[in-house]
Amino acid sequence: MTVYFIGAGPGAADLITVRGQRLLQRCPVCLYAGSIMPDDLLAQCPPGATIVDTGPLTLEQIVRKLADADADGRDVARLHSGDPSLYSALAEQCRELDALGIGYEIVPGVPAFAAAAAALKRELTVPGVAQTVTLTRVATLSTPIPPGEDLAALARSRATLVLHLAAAQIDAIVPRLLDGGYRPETPVAVVAFASWPQQRTLRGTLADIAARMHDAKITRTAVIVVGDVLTAEGFTDSYLYSVARHGRYAQ
């Protein structure tokens, strides 16, 4: 018996990986996070599968269901939105399974920030503009931010910054980014429900993005991207496909 932690992708059912889809279609048990999992993805579970929404469950209850499946010898597809390595509560589940001696595998998925970049038709690392992407979130009552990871500190590099789970706190976010070194005219883009049918995109700057988000009533399930890559045009071409590089290999 194996628990498969499967990255279900950002929303669109056809963005799950081929491996993830194959496992989902054969596992007799599926546990998923309810409000952010598309119905047409769950429809790919095999006939008669036990399908459980873990949204209302505690960690202890989730682990108990995994242990029950293990006792019955039934493989489990544990679906997480996006990629399991980001903001998925994967670590504590793996810790519990390790303690119980239950085997598991992790299947990567398309993360929300990648779907957001695709929606914006933008590369997040552009030569001469930014070669670093910082993925972060803001503090909540349940999840504090460790020392040194506050937004002002992260903003000092002025690299491309991607914020998850943060739309409702945009009024507090903007001043911290400005304090850290981003300019008021720094481009910002917001993608709500990236890859879902109801996907929406919004563009602005740090000076006006909060007002724009309020006007658009975007308060949840959104990725916020900050950085000059969003509007960069006169950048240097990548060396990867340059004449100099290919000429060297041709010699």
From Swiss-Prot:
Keyword presence, tRNA-binding: no
PROSITE patterns, alphabetized: SUMT_1, SUMT_2
Catalyses which reaction(s): precorrin-4 + S-adenosyl-L-methionine = precorrin-5 + S-adenosyl-L-homocysteine
Protein's GO biological process: cobalamin biosynthetic process; methylation
Keyword terms: Cobalamin biosynthesis, Methyltransferase, S-adenosyl-L-methionine, Transferase
Transmembrane spans: none
Top EC group: transferase
EC number assigned by the record: 2.1.1.133
Matches recorded under CDD domains: Precorrin-4_C11-MT
This protein's pathway: Cofactor biosynthesis; adenosylcobalamin biosynthesis; cob(II)yrinate a,c-diamide from precorrin-2 (aerobic route): step 4/10
InterPro entries, alphabetized: 4pyrrol_Mease, 4pyrrol_Methylase_sf, 4pyrrole_Mease_sub1, 4pyrrole_Mease_sub2, Cbl_synth_CobM/CibF, Siro_Cobalamin_biosynth, Uropor_MeTrfase_CS
GO molecular function, one term: precorrin-4 C11-methyltransferase activity
A Pfam entry, by short name: TP_methylase
Family: Belongs to the precorrin methyltransferase family.
Official protein name in the record: Precorrin-4 C(11)-methyltransferase
Source organism: Mycobacterium tuberculosis (strain CDC 1551 / Oshkosh)
